Design a protein with these regions (language model features):
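Conserved ATP/PPi-binding loop(s) of AMP-dependent carboxylate-activating enzymes
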Residues: 342-346, 357-388, 425
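Gly/Ser/Thr-rich phosphate-binding loop
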Residues: 230, 255-259, 270-335, 348, ...
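Conserved pre-ATP/AMP-binding loop-to-beta segment of ANL
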Residues: 9-10, 24-25, 137, 142, ...
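AMP-binding/adenylate-forming catalytic core of the ANL superfamily
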Residues: 95, 112-114, 258, 371, ...
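Conserved AMP-binding A3 loop
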Residues: 36-40, 170-194
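Conserved AMP-binding/adenylate-forming
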Residues: 35, 51-98, 424
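Structural core segment of the AMP-binding/adenylate-forming
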Residues: 55-56, 83-150, 465-467
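Conserved AMP-binding/adenylation subdomain of ANL enzymes
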Residues: 193-210, 218-257, 271
Length: 522
């Protein structure tokens, strides 16, 4: 045996196949209302889809897009593409046709696998925009062969992990696109393995985890699937996020672990039936994807318990740049609750100024990362790669300050910073202050064009049910804490703040709406 084979590293698909080949009778995966699938049943279904996809021509480096709501087949198809050494490109089920088509065209997708019942019309639209795109469905569809029927007629065969190397592309996707057009990016085997190494080693998992996921399995909803498998746990999948369904599932299934975004936490706390459910089984609630109001996080800890664990990452360095552990959530210190935690020991992290020089504690700087967690670059965008990979660092675009204990507090995206009257204003700080008011459920702050100041600080606020507050009171609250130059010039009350498919406040949509509706400034 050659030394290259003797010391060949393991990658994500090795872990997946090894784990699926053990403990076949252990319960593993259940879609709410459906049967509980054992490890052996998931293994066999994965094997059937491996064979079915191979018959469609999927093999090494074949680019396969996947579009579906939450159902077990999402995991079966994703795992099968990995085992065939193909490249998976998940399409967010709530994404727009334009964004889906952008990824398909930019990444050169060859096959689209979709859920026939829900997405046949979208698949047909995408096929018209991408000539040569082959279609396959699970469930009947008038425009494609049923991959599920083909798979069901095949006999399970042993699963064997492919030989892959660290630089091999495993996944294609897009950045969130909150500041402009989505950016197509590639994620290698190395990056995915680094992410799971950190998650398995650093995240605070119950033993064993009983996981609830309500996020799309094509995206963050699947992030807990492999850890649940490796740690002897189970995963209950909901079709989507609905507060009562989530709380009911936690109570009935004694869920001890879940992953949410901040807006989901707010929706649970504000629901009139919150107090009806027993959530005491929860041991760890992972949360991330966008900033959280410290005041609302304090409320969540006081009402649900000290179970919250924050992760910070981005598509370009996924999930695990920093971690704020459960024990580090100090309800008596709102500055700590505003922190995204400390850098993982598995990555090099620093804060740099506009001239790429390290900044001291207490001074804003851009979070920059290097190490195996960093993605391999944007596709077909050499200019953006040049500005993102600079000076030996990946520049995240997030601005943070570091305290003497090493905790980072993100003050904003560099592109969200407001320049008003020559002053740099970070919306995150104003949002946190507004959210401390007992009448405020959620706040978003943006800059809109102003003839005198360049940009005017503008707040968009969602009130809690049955609560009232005047714009003047909120403006005065910010002025008292941050000075009049940082106080909003206007406050607009809305029923809800638009979100991206990933659950982040969609400030691009907010800016567009406010600029459309704006009256001329005096």
């Amino acid at each position: 045996m050659g030394s290259d084979e003797l010391y060949r590293p393991l990658y994500v698909t090795d872990l997946l196949v090894n784990a699926l080949n053990q403990d076949p009778d252990r319960p593993l995966l259940q879609l709410l209302g459906g049967p509980m699938l054992t490890v052996g049943e998931v293994r066999d279904e994965t094997s059937r889809y491996v064979q079915a996809l191979a018959r469609l021509g999927v093999g090494r480096e074949t680019r396969v897009a996947l579009l579906s709501a939450n159902r077990p087949e999402v995991l079966h198809v994703s795992h099968a593409v990995q085992i065939l050494a193909g490249i998976i490109a998940p399409l967010h089920p709530l994404g727009s046709a334009a964004d889906h088509l952008y990824l398909i065209q930019d990444a050169g997708i060859e096959i689209l696998v979709f859920e026939g019942e829900r997405y046949s019309e979208r698949a047909a639209e995408l096929a018209r925009g991408a000539p040569g795109l082959r279609l396959a469905s699970f469930g009947p569809s008038p425009i494609a062969d049923d991959l599920g029927t083909l798979a069901a007629g095949l006999s399970p065969q042993p699963l064997v992990a492919p030989r892959v190397e660290g630089p091999d592309v495993m996944r294609l996707g897009c950045s969130g696109g909150t500041t402009g057009k989505p950016k197509s990016l590639t994620t290698s085997q190395r990056v995915c393995m680094a992410m799971f190494n950190v998650m398995l080693a650093e995240w605070e998992w119950p033993n064993p985890p009983r996981v609830l996921t309500c996020a799309p399995l094509s995206h963050s909803g699947a992030a807990l699937a492999l850890p649940a498998l490796l740690k002897g746990g189970t995963m209950l999948v909901l079709p989507g996020f609905e507060p009562v369904a989530v709380m009911q599932a936690i109570q009935e299934h004694r869920i001890n672990c879940t992953l949410v975004v901040p807006t989901m936490i707010y929706a649970l706390l504000d629901h009139p039936r919150f107090g009806e459910f027993d959530l005491s089984s929860l041991e760890t609630v992972f949360y991330g994807a966008s900033s959280i109001s410290p005041a609302r996080l304090k409320e969540a800890i006081e009402r649900i318990g000290p179970v919250f664990s924050q992760f910070y990452g981005q598509a370009e360095a996924p999930m695990v740049i920093t971690l704020l552990r459960k024990s580090e959530h100090d309800v008596n210190d709102l500055r700590r609750l505003a922190s995204c935690g400390r850098p993982t020991p598995w990555a090099h992290v620093t804060l740099l100024d506009a001239e790429d020089r390290p900044v001291p504690d207490g001074r804003p700087g851009e979070i920059c990362v290097r190490g195996p967690l960093v993605f391999d670059g944007y596709r077909n965008n050499p200019e953006l790669n040049t500005t993102t990979f600079r000076g030996g660092w990946h520049h995240t675009g997030d601005v943070a300050v570091r305290d003497p204990g090493g905790f980072l507090r993100i003050v904003d995206r560099t592109k969200d910073m407001i320049v008003s009257g020559g002053f740099n204003i970070y919306p995150r700080e104003i949002e946190d202050i507004l959210s401390e008011h007992p009448a405020v459920a959620q706040a978003a702050v943006i800059g809109v064009p102003h003839p005198k100041w360049g940009e005017a600080v503008t707040a968009v606020v969602v009130l809690r049910p049955g609560q009232e507050v005047t714009p003047e009171a909120l403006i005065g609250m910010v002025a008292e804490r941050k000075g009049s130059f940082q106080a909003p010039k206007t406050v607009t009350f809305v029923a809800s703040i638009p979100q991206t498919p990933l659950g982040k406040p969609d400030k691009k949509a907010l800016r567009a709406k406010l600029q459309r509706d704006a009256r001329p400034y005096p």
